[in-house]
UniProtKB/Swiss-Prot annotation:
Keyword annotations: Ribonucleoprotein, Ribosomal protein, RNA-binding, rRNA-binding
Protein family: Belongs to the bacterial ribosomal protein bS20 family.
Record flagged with keyword Ribosomal protein: yes
Protein name from the UniProt record: Small ribosomal subunit protein bS20
Function: Binds directly to 16S ribosomal RNA.
Gene transcribed to yield this protein: rpsT
One Gene Ontology CC term in the entry: ribosome
Pfam families per the UniProt record, alphabetical: Ribosomal_S20p (PF01649)
Alphabetical list of InterPro entries matching this protein: Ribosomal_bS20 (IPR002583), Ribosomal_bS20_sf (IPR036510)
GO molecular function ontology, one term from the record: rRNA binding
GO biological process, one term: translation
Entries under SUPFAM superfamilies matching the protein: Ribosomal protein S20
Length: 84
């Protein structure tokens, strides 16, 4: 167990950050699933804009890796464009 005040605080802060990052990452995964489950092109296009913005913000905050965000956006764009 940690002996110093600063290390105890650092552990506490890292746990809070871990839970926050976990929540945002899960929210993003659910949003991606919602797009992939959509068969309507118009609705998928609207959702794509929101999810794209969300992924960029998460990559900027280092919750997910920048390349992962770009790969997800690319795959989702291909999916949305393939809808009729």
């Amino acid at each position: 167990m940690a002996n110093h005040k600063s290390s105890i605080k650092r552990i506490r802060k890292s746990q809070i950050r871990r839970l926050r990052n976990k929540y945002y990452a899960k929210t993003a995964r659910n949003a991606v699933k919602n797009i992939r489950g959509t068969a309507d092109k118009v609705q998928a296009g609207v959702l794509y804009k929101k999810v794209s913005k969300m992924l960029d913000k998460l990559a900027k905050k280092n919750v997910i890796h920048n390349n992962k965000a770009n790969n997800l956006k690319s795959k989702l764009a291909l999916y949305v464009n393939s809808l009729n």
